[in-house]
Swiss-Prot record:
It is found in: Nucleus, Nucleolus; Nucleus, Nucleoplasm. PANTHER family: MINA53 MYC INDUCED NUCLEAR ANTIGEN, RIBOSOMAL OXYGENASE 1. It is an enzyme of class 1 (oxidoreductase). This is Ribosomal oxygenase 1. Interacts with SP7/OSX; the interaction is direct. Interacts with MYC. Interacts with PHF19; leading to its recruitment to H3K36me3 sites.
Length: 597
């Protein structure tokens, strides 16, 4: 069985661990400390809102198609039978694509080492001119990534990649009928569908040339006679140790593959904008005729992408309502704890399996064939309950401070008719007490800092996010593409400047969030994040009150361009100061390349 992120003994939905580099943070941070703006700034509110309305982006077009898709809706009584062809048929061979003669090992080592040194830097999308020459360019994955490189809006790129991930299942149908409700199986009959995303040769390369450690980056586990064993030796996961454990029947689970694999990073960085929630992943390599993990359920929405080999999966519905859409992962279950599976199937390369939080699952390799799959995970602790858990204490605090009814004393004799021992009492005083509680609870909604808590959750998402992946266009039109360099003993091509005539928009849609803290405004952003989870402290810029409406206009008008001279500021100096600061940080792009002065 393969354990998804944050299962029992598994890593939580994080991209990895590392020592943090601290950055000075704004003081007085509080979700109740909303920004204070001078009256002179508020006169721009109406004009800013009208500009946003005029610049509103067109809605995305959705496509419909026939699909070879199975869900478990309506299959509660008996498990889906394992197809006869899946029991006996040998896997169809995946065509081997010859490597270019130029793709020698030293070049590959040099390229990946350079990527490792720049984990937090934006990178171009696959399909651009700097992509790995060893990747199979004609695979469906590489074709869609090349297509994304030509889509100007990051929103549309995220929607397109998710559409490709589910294809031929329409995303709108998936969200309306299946998301958080049913397990879904998509069969594609195309072993090359995910080719270029991740492979066993990629894992072998990482063991040889990257600093991979047992327990931190790689787990070795097996499930024998109803017991799971984790067999992580201390220290670095060198090939000799890792492959010896694999030969001994251990599954290898690579945590945070996006920290090592540029393609996995790029895949997740695009999809995180679709979910509005952190997207993580693990990779699982299981030897033939073995099972790595015990049956369990997880606290994330799981998308299983079968990359190599074959694997038998059994998926079970939550056993009772308390396990439905679980907020925490389960302990390991025994086979006696399980009922009949609602879905039993063999995944082959190119297939996709989705199941919600709380669905128990286990998987094993059979027929002498290994299995490699990637689990994409999202929506960990991203529920209404989690949101209200943050809102209600703050609402209570505000209500006590602002409404005298919450400060009035309890009845002197309330213990005579309240409490468990009086729960069956018909005392009218008890009825009046309960009514008073209901009235006060209903009033709490007036004090709920909903927007402030939403901003704090958005700030957390910005910190959780992977750094953005840039298209060729985004790189060429932003500071990342300026031709400034050192040449002949001095820097050259220095001097490009924004003017009031320059047209700009944000680099991407989900890369920044404006948050009020301690009476000040801060713009939190992702472009300097690491591919390793929280390796860096949150990054932010202070936005002055006279620039607040202009900043909001830039955030809300994406992907439409705004002329710098039209930003709602009090002066040209404020307009240019804000635009230049954002451009220099890599947060803005221009409609045309800047002209060197």
């Amino acid at each position: 069985m393969d354990e998804l992120p944050n299962g029992n003994g598994a890593a939580p939905l994080k991209r990895g661990r590392g020592r943090r580099r601290r950055q000075p943070q704004p003081r007085g941070a509080s979700v109740l400390a909303l920004p204070l703006r001078p009256r002179k700034v508020r006169r721009h509110r109406k004009s800013a809102a009208s500009r946003v309305a005029a610049l509103r982006a067109r809605a995305l077009l959705s496509e419909d198609s026939d699909s070879n898709v199975e869900s478990v809706r309506g299959k509660r009584e008996r498990p889906a039978e394992l197809p006869e062809a899946s029991r006996s048929a040998e896997p169809r061979p995946v065509p081997v694509r010859p490597r270019p003669a130029s793709a020698t090992l030293p070049r590959r080592v040099e390229g990946r080492a350079a990527l490792s040194r720049n984990l937090g830097k934006p990178a171009p999308l696959p399909g651009s001119h700097v992509d790995d020459p060893e990747r199979p360019w004609d695979s469906p994955l590489q074709q869609v990534l090349a297509e994304l490189n030509g889509i100007p809006s990051s929103r549309r790129r995220a929607a397109r990649l998710f559409e490709w991930l589910l294809a031929p299942l329409p995303p709108d149908h998936f969200y309306r009928r299946l998301w958080e409700r049913e397990a879904v199986l998509v069969r594609r009959q195309d072993h090359s569908y995910y080719e270029g995303l991740f492979s066993t040769s990629d894992l072998d390369w990482m063991l040889r040339y990257e600093d991979v450690h047992f327990g931190q980056h790689l787990d070795a586990a097996r499930y024998i006679d109803g017991r799971r064993e984790t067999l992580n030796p201390p220290g670095r996961a060198l090939p000799a140790a890792a492959w010896s454990l694999y030969q001994a029947g251990c599954s290898l689970r690579l945590l945070c593959p996006q920290a090592f694999s540029p393609t996995v990073w790029q895949f997740l960085a695009v999809l995180q904008e679709q979910f509005g929630s952190m997207a993580g992943s693990n990779v699982y390599l299981t030897p033939p005729n073995s099972q790595g993990f015990a049956p369990h359920y997880d606290d994330i929405e799981a998308f299983v992408l079968q990359l190599e080999g074959r694997k038998l999966w059994r998926v079970y519905r939550p056993r009772d309502p308390s396990e439905e859409l679980a907020l925490t992962s389960s302990p390991n279950f025994s086979q006696e704890d399980l009922g009949e599976p609602v879905l039993q199937t063999v995944l082959e390369p190119g297939d996709l399996l989705y199941f919600p939080r709380g669905f128990i699952h286990q998987a094993e390799c059979q027929d002498g064939v290994h299995s490699l799959h990637l689990t994409l995970s999202t929506y960990q602790r991203n529920t209404w309950g989690d949101f209200l858990e943050a809102v209600l204490p703050l609402a209570m605090q505000a209500a006590i401070e602002e409404n005298v009814e919450f400060r009035r004393g309890l009845p002197r004799d309330f213990m005579d008719y309240m409490g468990a021992q009086h729960s069956d009492s018909k005392d009218p005083r008890r009825t009046a007490f309960m009514e008073k509680v209901r009235v006060l609870v209903a009033r709490l909604g007036h004090f709920a800092p909903v927007d402030a808590v939403a901003d704090q959750r958005a700030k957390d998402f910005i910190h959780d996010s992977l750094p953005p992946v840039l298209t060729d266009r985004e790189r060429a039109l932003s500071v990342h593409g300026l031709p400034i360099r050192w040449e002949a003993g001095e820097p050259v091509n220095v001097g490009a400047q924004l003017t009031t005539e320059t047209q700009v928009h944000m680099l991407q849609d989900g890369i920044a969030r404006l948050v009020g803290e301690g009476g000040r405004l801060f713009l939190y952003y992702t472009v300097e994040n690491s591919r390793v989870y929280h390796l860096e402290e949150p990054k932010c810029l202070e936005i002055y009150p006279q620039q607040a409406d202009a900043m909001e206009l830039l955030l809300r008008s994406y992907p439409e361009f705004v002329r710098v001279g039209d930003l709602p500021c009090d002066s040209v100096e404020d307009q240019l100061s804000l635009a230049t600061m954002l451009y220099d940080k890599g947060l803005l792009l221009t409609k045309t390349p800047l002209v060197l002065s």
